[in-house]
Amino acid sequence: MCLSVSLNFHRVKDNKPIALVAKQSILVYKVLEVRGKHYYTPYMSKAVNFDDEYGMFFYKTTRFSIDRAYFGGQYHYGVLRGVHSYFDFDKANDSSDFLNKIFDVLNIHYAIIPKGSKFYIGSNCDIASSNLVVFENEAKYNENKEYFGDEPIEFSEYYKKFGTELDSK
């Protein structure tokens, strides 16, 4: 999956969009492929093994990979490396409906972008983040979300509260 960076949310500096920093944990949705009793990321087929006790899986990406292309009279930026998810459940569902034509079975999982993580907002209600915690199911999310120090909020609430403050602290 490649995220097309929405320049409505990001400034560009030195030919790269500037990542935002989560000021509060953000609730997002991760689409995973199911093969038997195992989970994988679509496209990259990275195995996702949930912790037996807490039902969580931690992603950590140390650096984003940004690609720049010029077409249609302007530059477009894509995030190739980063942890991809959706901030809108309906868009995640639309994506899984489309991807089900390619992959056998897909599930949508609750996930959290932890406070302090860097992230890019895409043009299709998608997000690429430097960190992501994916939960096996909604019950595991509800049981364990408190361990992240603050209450995760939906992106729409996050945007109302913080906008796109470009604060890297």
Predicted regions and their residues:
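Conserved NAD+-utilizing ADP-ribose enzyme module
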Residues: 1-83, 89-169
